[in-house]
Amino acid sequence: MFFGFLPPCYDDSDTDVQSIMLPEIIYHEAGHAVVSEVLCPESVSLIYVGNGKSRESGVTHLYNNQNTTSQYWAKSRLTTVLAGAASTEQKFGTVDSGAHSDYERAFDLAEKLVEENCIDGLHLFSFKYGHSQNYLSAQEQVVTAEVERYYRKAKEIIALNKEFLEKLAAALAEKKLLCEADIKKIKDECKIVPVAL
């Protein structure tokens, strides 16, 4: 599973824009990695930030070796998807303008949890009844509430594991590419605070 940060298009010859965007991308990708590692240890295989063809970009690659049908796995993926934006907001106090695809993925994951896994009760189980306007309205409210809840959970995990975030971001700023061994070494140097979903 990949999480990527692709900011709005701009002229990549504009070094002022590049110097502004790269720190945000670093913390965005570090946020994905921190939350994933706290919730599912040894789940991140690679983090990269750098120049794409026309813009700065970043990628965090996660192993997909978890039981993908479990609610814990689904909730941890939802929280991890939101962690890039949560990290950027906490570090810079701004909304993450490059997280659109992460937000879309988060809403898709939350909808699946609500419809198929009944995390908010059986009344929104999607396979039993048709999709009336009342059903769709109720589902929209519950899905939005779940995304908000897991966004707050991502922020909590990042706040409690700030040392790991800062060390990971510093290493990423220096090297631009961190492999599994690099991530493990940094993590082993930090006090990791587990957080329940």
Residues of each region from the PLM?
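Conserved AAA+ ATPase small/helical "lid" subdomain
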Residues: 1-2
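Soluble catalytic regions of large protease machineries
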Residues: 7-27, 33-197
